Amino acid sequence: MNASTSTGTAVPTTPRLTSLSHGGGCGCKIAPGVLSELLAKSNLPKQFFPDLLVGTETADDAAVYKINDEQAIVATTDFFMPIVDDPYDFGRIAATNALSDIYAMGGTPLMALAIVGMPINMLPHDVIAKILEGGESVCRDAGIPLAGGHSIDSVEPIYGLVGIGIVNPKQMKRNADAKAGDVLILGKPLGVGILSAALKKNLLDEAGYAAMISATTQLNRPGADLSKLDGVHALTDVTGFGLLGHALELARGAQLSAHIDSAHLPVLPDVQSLAEQGIFTGASGRNWASYGEHIQIDSSVSDARKALLTDPQTSGGLLVSCAADAAEQVLKVFADSGFGEAAVIGHMESGEAKVFVR
């Protein structure tokens, strides 16, 4: 890609990172319905390893392998294409998102490996270096080494991490153990996908961008502390399938109904007005097409609010299912860690494994 000077000399220009990918962030995920179909057709054999505590049988955030009665390894991988144009911010967001899966299991990160795919002949090497630096800065913030990785020359920019963590098997939290009567608490405000769509359309101002970066680069550290609370029954993080998709996973895992109060959702600045203007990602529609038949939304809920409920979150917040009498303690753990917008957004009830929204 070139631009011309006043003398007519061709000068190479750096393309916007988001212009090099067909999607960005966790909105790149294969739609949940399509993924289920692919896995069903793959005929993967069931695995019987007594020390594999969490594998492919459930929709959990990471694999967990028991080492002894007090320690288990948590392993996950996550990567995607750019959600922003700033390379350093892209690296930070991707790394924060990858480590979130460890926190969502109640674990503590130990180390990470980088996954790097870059169009080497299209991106200046100093841009790629900034992506790597952004990822390393998050690992440093998490107190872990970025110990290596693997790279390829790819058509679209891809960056992420393999994350390795540790958890006490007795304190590990899954997304399938919610109980009837639990309240649902969301740790971060929603709207990252809508803000990223606005960014691509040049409709996002500096304040909106700053809010998006702040949310997506905030490590979900409270997960490790929440896992130690007896009243916390289930834990996951809200990412590419949107709040409804991950709430549905909680409902299916526990064979309960999840009930969401849309009026109580924490929302990033400007997101509601952008949604009312029809700004949202293609992944939002794909999410609804995949699981909409299992969602019941009250007629009073606006279309803009519905878009927010299916909005793919990149490096989204923890979704906690806890006993009602533990809610205050859970909110305090969030607040003490800088998650001041954490809020009670619903509850779990006995009933059909669906999500009900009012």
Q: For each of these PLM feature ranges, what is it?
A:
Residues 2-358:
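Helix-biased detector of long, well-ordered alpha-helical tracts
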